[in-house]
Amino acid sequence: MKKILSILLALALMLGATFALAEGNVTIAVQGMNDFNDYIQSMVVYGDRLLLSSWDRLYTWDNATRKLTEVEGYGELESTLTGDDETPGVLDLNDGDYAYLDGNLYIVGGRLYRMATVTDSDGNASNQLVELLIADDGALSLGEVIDLGDALCITESDGDQTYSYTRSLSNPCSFGNTLYALSYGDELELLALNLEDETVETLTLDVDGDVQSIAPYTEGKLLMIVNNYDADPVTTTLCLYDIENEEAAELGALPTADYDTPNGISYDEARGKLYYVLSGSVWRMDVTEDGLGEPEEFGDMPLGYASGNGVVYGDLYVLADSDAKEIPAKSRFF
């Protein structure tokens, strides 16, 4: 059920609000953009750019105009991936292979990637991370290919037929040449994708509750939102996960509102603060390895739910939301 829900939420990302991080009450810098009708699946800060991607479109945020600008050529990258009768593609495909790129963006080792899935004529899948290059003039092309084989694939049987599909990666973040993400197999797992070795490792995930999301903290450490659904009402703990030791330590309890729990988390190392959304408000909190500061409510959140994590981009905290039906068309943003 959780796996299905995560896919539905990814397809539903449509609205957003951008919040200034200055001291005092929050100010909504942007909420909505007329006539915008796309479903944002991924947001990343890449160099000095804020990039947002849907299944077949790439957008960049323009601080001067306060608008999203579509990057030309994104939808044609699959042709570059597979090639045609006259031009070879980036991937070396066999007859009967089918390949496509998903709508997510990943940053590892300062490079930008997309995930390609290749399915052969027997229904067996494999994956490659393909570098996305953006030239100074905005032209897009594909670069190096990281072959992950079938390490991200789940195989199922239907009678005499077997088929495989790619598991989704939630809250992807990286340190060095390794990408970390939550992913459902038979259960929720924390995966480490080493691009140098082209390997995928499952890390130990031993916490008292259910991990809801992860976010990068400092080098080699992740923040984890952990909910305890056995409590009534539910309780939420912020944990610090040490990647090298594969251990999680509790930093402290996060506030909840009945069954509403924190979401849209993003940690800003420069400010030493965690930003999140809870019950119609935006919150911030000091975080150190010794514990948590007092949560501070610093603005109203006009959207009902932030799907996925937020991102900090300079002085802005950017969120995406799925409550399109509750927001007037004139306020639509992404």
Give short role names for the model-derived ranges.
Residues 1-8:
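Positively charged n-region of N-terminal signal peptides that target proteins for export
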Residues 62-66, 134-138, 194-198, 242-246, ...:
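Short loop/turn segments that connect beta-strands within beta-propeller blades
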Residues 26-34, 69-72, 78-81, 87-95, ...:
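A short beta-strand motif characteristic of beta-propeller blades
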Residues 22-59, 64-66:
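An edge-strand/N-cap motif at the start of beta-rich repeat modules
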Residues 57-60, 121-131, 187-191, 231-239, ...:
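Structural motif
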Residues 52, 114, 181, 224-226, ...:
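Residue position within the beta-strands of beta-propeller blades
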Residues 37-44, 90-107, 153-157, 164-173, ...:
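Repeated scaffold domains used in trafficking and secretory/extracellular systems
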